[in-house]
Amino acid sequence: MSTDAVFRPHRWRDLARDLRWWGQDYLYAATAQVRAAGPGRPDDLASGPHRPLVLLPGIYETWRFLEPLANALHARGHPVHVVTGLGSNRRPIVESAGRVAELLVDRDLDDVVLVAHSKGGLIGKQVMAFEPAGARVRAMVAVATPFGGSRYSRLMPTPSLRAFRSGDATMRALGASAAVNARIVSVYGAFDPHIPEGSELAGARNVRLEGGGHFRVLADPRVIAEVIRAAE
């Protein structure tokens, strides 16, 4: 019996699993975007006695995409700060990092843990590696972040999505800035339809989840557990 004959059923099962995760992923994303369209009061989250957290959503996401995570962490006593200047996070990484740094300084936040999704992790690393205010950051927990870029980026229709090419100047600079990696926790699924290269980051604490997806992994209990580990 050939090797292909032995392993082909496994490949079909893996494909079926990945397609199921993909469908569940977009259902989660659609539900989150509908929720994010409603009113929100970020200032209500900014109080608490414990270590401060700053939310960094992904591209085309507002802070409310991360609201369930923010509410859970705020309930544990952490002030959760929102960078409203990011909007839906379509600006270049360097510009967005400047806005995050400005918030850290304006609110005099120190010993901060960044909580990031996707592009937000690149913005957070840009702050940590290149902004003077990066010294105010204790750690970052980044979920489904394309630290090595995504090969799909070059096929995208907008400059904001094509910015994730591995050959992009900002992406190359971030890749070369390995000194801050030890302060980063990279959490990612077993399958990510947006990042075929994966989100493993050399020198970081890498946490591979059993489930898959790019969006729905935000609801995995390990995400909150890793933020708590970094912040408490």
Predicted segments with their positions:
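Flexible, membrane-associating and regulatory peripheral segments of lipid-active enzymes
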Residues: 1-54, 60-82, 106-109, 231
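Short, function-defining helix-loop hinge/capping sites that tune catalysis or transport
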Residues: 26, 65, 92, 152, ...
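Hydrophobic alpha-helical segments, principally membrane-spanning helices and signal/leader peptides
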Residues: 42-43, 129, 177, 199, ...
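A broad structural signal for short, well-ordered beta-strand segments within beta-sheet-rich domains
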Residues: 49, 137, 203-204
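Serine-dependent carboxylesterase/thioesterase catalytic core
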Residues: 53-64, 68, 72-182, 194-195
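C-terminal catalytic-base region of ester-bond hydrolases, centering on the histidine
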Residues: 180-232
